Amino acid sequence: MNKNNVIDSLFNIIEDRKDKPIEGSYTGYLFEKGLDKILKKVGEESSEVIIAAKNEDKEELIKEICDLTYHIMVLMVEKQIKLDGIEKELEKRREKICNKKNERKTIERL
């Protein structure tokens, strides 16, 4: 399966679980519990990514990055952020990747 298709498919499933909850669904559980629970999971998974990277366990790191990615996608759906919005922002930033630090524009707002 194409890489983007896996991500798109997962995102679509997450959106579907928000719109049409299924009993026993972990994704549905997260949406039911709300933003605070979702943010807690994003924080936990972020910490687990850091620990796995520090332990230099590549397989565990891959698994933790997948967990974090999933929870970030749940957060995106909760906050009504689409994948194409992220893609557009990354595309804008890609233009700056090769710039040297002194060549970058000053950030005017955060």
Swiss-Prot record:
Its main location: cytoplasm. SUPFAM superfamilies: all-alpha NTP pyrophosphatases. InterPro entries: HisE (IPR008179), PRib-ATP_PPHydrolase-like (IPR021130). One of its GO terms (cellular component) is cytoplasm. Gene3D superfamilies: MazG-like (1.10.287.1080). NCBIfam families: histidine_hisI. This is Phosphoribosyl-ATP pyrophosphatase.
